[in-house]
């Protein structure tokens, strides 16, 4: 996403803990990288003013990772959300885009899921994502546009490949072991 935005001519500030390394993105005249924790409200108050849009991707990003440390997951995925939205709105942000998850739908019998369906999150990870959606919508106003996306499993080529996602796990097994290991059997992936 960062490289695409830069290619389109946007100025981009990346705010990240950098737990996977600090030299992931190439240097670019329109790219500013700030190492920081989404829970640090004072740092957010310094960084956010002067920007037009926040694309909020910072979270513990799946159920297994979340379950390793539920209190950490809650502090990052839920507790830090309202302060981030309030700081963004008061800091002059015009557009706030939130990356939720398709897991907020829970398990549906219907083949096609749409935004009008009742949310039935099954885990704390997806429940907190649904809670954040509700919080964000309360802040929507004429001068603070909010947008929520609910991506399914995101996979594909990346400079920092994630091997905790099922599609990438299967690809890794196929390439390195010349076999595909099937796990479970009852899961449905959007």
Residues covered by each model-derived region:
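NAD(P)-dependent short-chain dehydrogenase/reductase
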Residues: 134-190
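Glycine-rich NAD(P)-binding loop of the Rossmann-fold in SDR/ketoreductase-type enzymes
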Residues: 39, 68-83, 119, 123, ...
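Conserved Rossmann-fold NAD(P)-dependent oxidoreductase catalytic core, especially the SDR/UDP-sugar
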Residues: 56, 82-123
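N-terminal Rossmann/SDR dinucleotide-binding element
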Residues: 1-53
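Conserved catalytic-core motifs of eukaryotic protein kinase domains, centered on the activation segment
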Residues: 24-26, 64-71, 107-111, 159-160
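Conserved active-site helix of classical SDR/Rossmann-fold NAD(P)-dependent CH-OH oxidoreductases
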Residues: 3, 81-82, 126, 130-137, ...
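Conserved sequence/active-site signature of Rossmann-fold short-chain dehydrogenase/reductase
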Residues: 39, 104-105, 154-156
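NAD(P)H-binding glycine-rich loop region in Rossmannoid oxidoreductase-like domains
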Residues: 38-76
């Amino acid at each position: 996403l960062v490289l695409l935005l830069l290619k389109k001519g946007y100025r981009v500030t990346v705010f990240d803990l950098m737990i996977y390394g600090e030299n992931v993105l190439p240097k670019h005249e329109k790219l500013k990288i700030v190492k920081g924790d989404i829970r640090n409200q004072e740092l957010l108050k310094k960084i956010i003013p002067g920007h037009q849009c926040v694309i909020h991707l910072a979270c513990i990003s799946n159920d297994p990772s979340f379950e390793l440390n539920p209190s950490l997951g809650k502090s990052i995925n839920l507790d830090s959300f309202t302060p981030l939205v309030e700081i963004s709105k008061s800091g002059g942000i015009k557009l706030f885009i939130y990356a939720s998850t398709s897991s907020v739908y829970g398990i549906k019998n219907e083949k096609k899921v749409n935004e009008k369906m009742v949310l039935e999150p099954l885990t704390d990870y997806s429940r907190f994502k649904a809670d954040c959606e509700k919080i964000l919508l309360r802040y929507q106003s004429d001068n603070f546009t909010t947008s929520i996306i609910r991506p399914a499993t995101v996979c594909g080529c990346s400079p920092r490949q994630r091997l905790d996602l099922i599609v990438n796990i299967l690809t890794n097994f196929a390439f390195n072991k010349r076999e595909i290991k099937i796990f479970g059997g009852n899961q449905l992936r959007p």
